[in-house]
From Swiss-Prot:
Mitochondrial matrix topological domain residue ranges: 1-41
Protein name in UniProt: Cytochrome b-c1 complex subunit 8-2, mitochondrial
Mitochondrial intermembrane side: 59-72
Claim: Metal-binding is one of the keywords in the record: no
Family the entry assigns: Belongs to the UQCRQ/QCR8 family.
Keyword Transport in annotation: yes
GO cellular component: mitochondrial inner membrane; plasma membrane; respiratory chain complex III
Record InterPro entries: Cyt_b-c1_8-plants, Cyt_bc1_su8_sf
Length: 72
């Protein structure tokens, strides 16, 4: 006599339609959170944005000079 497999019922997790307060913590003190993130990471932001803006402006300047060179 072997053991018979026992069928287990699956557990289903669901939210009550009357108690859906999942995202409230995300919006709580949002301006304060944004200020904290910006003041904490401003050096990294500058180091990321400065080369991108510099490269873009150089490319635009070079393209404009090339257009003006072939004008005459």
């Amino acid at each position: 006599m072997g053991k018979q497999p026992v069928k287990l019922k699956a557990v289903v997790y669901a939210l009550s339609p009357f108690q859906q307060k999942i995202m409230t913590g995300l919006w709580k003190d949002l301006p304060e959170k944004i200020h904290h993130k910006v003041s904490e990471n401003w050096i990294s932001t500058i180091l990321l944005v400065a080369p991108v803006v510099g490269t873009y402006s150089y490319a635009q300047y070079f393209k404009e000079q090339e257009k003006l060179e072939h004008r005459f």
